[in-house]
């Protein structure tokens, strides 16, 4: 006997299916389910009178043959697709994406549920990979709480706390600081990796930082990003299979953007602040988007361009870079970095896939808890101002959604050599997953899983008779306690450091994972974000021309994902 359900009734019971569309928060972005892995009439759902019961949707298989956790009927939004599926997690990793149930009595089951299986109800929820923020100033450890609550599960950058150098640059300088920061990483339920200081003209000061555990090196203009330092740093990176991140020379003291590109010598580099106001060669750092060896990112303070963007930037810049507004040269330095024309162009370059990544620049002009919000606000603004992308249809914004989610998930992972572990929802990867109600997508996750275990969730009064009574707010869960913390989060290091046994020498509790394949990644590998336009910036007007087209747009006067979500 069969029962025909309306689409609305089906979606309310099991979540949306193929052909259904979902609005992301209060934006103008609509995603459409491309495929449903479940079988109609054989869906599994937990609860009283529901399917996942002994002898029904739950089989008799032992723990070795079933997942530890199944997320049922979830909508997966990832760079590779937008699908409805059950997600299996085993030993902290994504084990399968498919159809869960009891294979002894149900057809088409690819994920067997057993008595050893926990269930998370994903009906009506969107699941994304945990975000990766590659531009962290480790100024305060409390940033980690904010980042995790926003859906970020991996933080890469440098620093030692609120030291003056860290306030301005993302460097953890020297072996002693590197060891201390790696030891500190054991205390936080998030994946961490640290960049050493790359500003030196001889190899040994850099090699010793890689050997101490750095995942790469950071060149920053405040330490002197000269062509000699760039060349030396990239040579060390090539020898150690690590990445280099660079904040280029705003003042053009040691050369112009062409000098910096020449110093790259075609070698792979992650260019921070490839943007309209964050720093680097003024006014034309955007030119580097056209280089095959350059992996460009921008940061969230200029995302997206609004009527308030320019006003807040001057004071932020003066504080972050230890400048004095009473000194004319310092003021001129700051003003040279803030250009409305290049900020506007940054919006469009993101939308067309020329800028491959988006990060925070935490407490150093950027907001650590707003990477994901600002990404989707930019996508919304571009949809409203520029319409559908050529790859999309009138029904949905699927390609645009895949392009923007890739900017803070898979592309940062590929850039920094950690894509074998994190960055996407694929079997074999670490189960860092973020669950969202569509109305709160990108803003306030319902639950964050780290290594397959719930680390943070919206939870009501712990003394209440049920989980939901107010006050409901984010509370740390069991993955953040005791020995579970070290077994559900990762610390990324160089292969050189791992081979040298730093885990034992430093007494680290977390599993260390070496980065790899950092030197052979190119712009062509940046998923959905590989466009390499020929860019010029007028030195007088700051107009940005890409492949012969003027890139300009109006500032937004109002944004979604903003005040209506943060009244309390």
Curated annotation (Swiss-Prot):
Keywords: Cytoplasm, Hydrolase, Metal-binding, Nickel
Swiss-Prot/TrEMBL GO biological process terms: urea catabolic process
Localization, UniProt: Cytoplasm
Organism classification: Bacteria, Pseudomonadati, Pseudomonadota, Betaproteobacteria, Burkholderiales
Protein name listed in UniProt: Urease subunit alpha
Chain coiled-coil ranges: none
Broad enzyme group: hydrolase
Pathway recorded for this protein: Nitrogen metabolism; urea degradation; CO(2) and NH(3) from urea (urease route): step 1/1
